[in-house]
A protein has these predicted regions:
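Acyltransferase donor/substrate-recognition loop-hinge adjacent to the catalytic core
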Residues: 2-9, 145-220
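A conserved beta-strand-loop-helix scaffold within acyl/acetyltransferase catalytic domains
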Residues: 18-61, 66-78, 202-278
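Surface-exposed, active-site-proximal loop segments in enzymatic domains
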Residues: 77-92, 127-139
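A short, internal acetyl-CoA/4′-phosphopantetheine-binding micro-motif in the GNAT/acyltransferase core
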Residues: 83-95, 122-125, 275-284
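Conserved acetyl-CoA-binding loop-helix of GNAT-fold acetyltransferases
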Residues: 93-107, 278, 284-297
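Non-catalytic accessory segments adjacent to catalytic cores
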Residues: 104-122, 126, 154-160
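Active-site/acyl-donor-binding loops of N-acyltransferases
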Residues: 124-177, 247, 261-266, 272-280, ...
């Protein structure tokens, strides 16, 4: 069985390669409106993003693309990522296709000196990453990986293993947690802390504070890397076109300094709790609980009775919020890994 691999770095006509690479998911999922198919102008930007050694490649059978992906080195020693992965998962030869993918990964990583590869991660965890691996009820949300669940299953069947597990969990009975955390909110006010809801559109000062705090909060997060301000602002602007962030808020110290935030929004009649971050010098004062109280109360006052604890690393402290409410459903996601032979 013969497959052909084409690399961007060795392509004679790089513009044609970019068009073919970005067009593949549009062709593969032409009849599936649940799959996010980015316009060429957006996806082609990936070819200008990464400053470390990387490449893009296509696997073809008889001249027809059956898989696309990128591969890159990372700031972490001996570690590479694969990402932007799409493949013809319904193809009767799909395991042969993925075996060729593994072979290509092994060869590239051996040449570059990487001993392990994680993915899918589109260059960094600031950009889309993870695969959907399990759905136990509940609606699908815009922040979730949208590739078919078969991707994760099939990659495992050819030798990839779970590196890290994440979950989104749906709950109802918001009143329980609102009542429970009201005292934390009131205590925070007594200590001089204040909470400031996001405006409809963040100005330059707001964005710089959000960027500054994010770099500080995520520095110790799994696979965290820095992000420059312009890229951060572009990503936020793109997301804010889809989601209403006016339920989100900044947390301010008694001297008016922004020292934390709680990012959340409404989707499918759920209040989606996305990210809570507090400066480590102010932790242990109930500020996370206080911000949860204020945002969830605002949602409840509008008739929202359910919440999602979104994209949480399994075993993280933030999982504890859900133990106070009635559990409805869970969606699981994974980062996969492959040791280089």
């Amino acid at each position: 069985m013969s497959f052909q691999i084409e690399y961007y770095t060795s392509a004679e006509n790089k513009n044609d390669f970019i068009v073919e690479f970005t067009n593949f998911p549009k062709v593969l999922y032409a009849d599936n409106n649940k799959i996010n198919k980015l316009p060429f102008e957006i996806e082609s930007l990936y070819f200008k993003l990464h400053h470390l050694t990387h490449d893009f490649f296509l696997i073809k059978e008889n001249g027809v693309v059956v898989l696309r992906s990128m591969i890159c080195l990372t700031p972490f020693p001996d570690l590479a990522y694969f990402g932007l992965l799409d493949f013809d998962y319904k193809n009767v030869k799909v395991k042969n296709i993925l075996s060729e993918f593994k072979k290509m990964i092994n060869s590239w990583c051996q040449i570059q000196g990487a001993s392990k590869i994680y993915g899918p991660i589109n260059f960094s965890t600031w950009l889309p990453y993870r695969l959907l691996s399990s759905v136990d009820g509940g609606p699908m949300f815009s922040f979730e990986p949208d590739r078919p669940i078969e991707y994760c299953q099939l990659l495992k069947e050819v030798g990839f293993t779970t590196n890290q597990l994440f979950s989104s969990k749906g709950y109802e009975e918001l009143d329980t947690i609102i009542n429970l955390y009201q005292s934390d909110y009131e205590k925070a006010l007594e200590l001089g802390f204040t909470f400031e809801f996001f405006p409809k559109e963040l100005d330059l000062v707001d964005m710089k504070d959000l960027h500054r705090l994010s770099l500080k909060f995520f520095d110790d997060n799994y696979l965290a890397t820095p992000i420059d301000f312009d890229t951060f602002r572009t990503l936020y602007a793109s997301q804010s076109k889809k989601d209403d962030f006016t339920f989100s808020l900044f947390i301010k110290s008694s001297d008016g300094e922004r020292i934390g935030y709680f990012i959340n929004f409404i989707e499918h009649d759920y209040c989606v709790a996305k990210t809570i971050g507090i400066d480590k010098n102010y932790r242990g004062k109930g500020l996370s609980n206080g911000s949860m109280y204020l945002s969830l109360k605002k949602a409840a006052d509008m008739g929202i009775s359910k919440t999602v604890m979104a994209m949480v690393k399994e075993g993280a402290q933030s999982e504890s919020y859900g133990r106070k409410m009635k559990h409805l459903w869970v969606h699981l996601y994974e980062i996969l890994e492959l040791s280089i032979a």
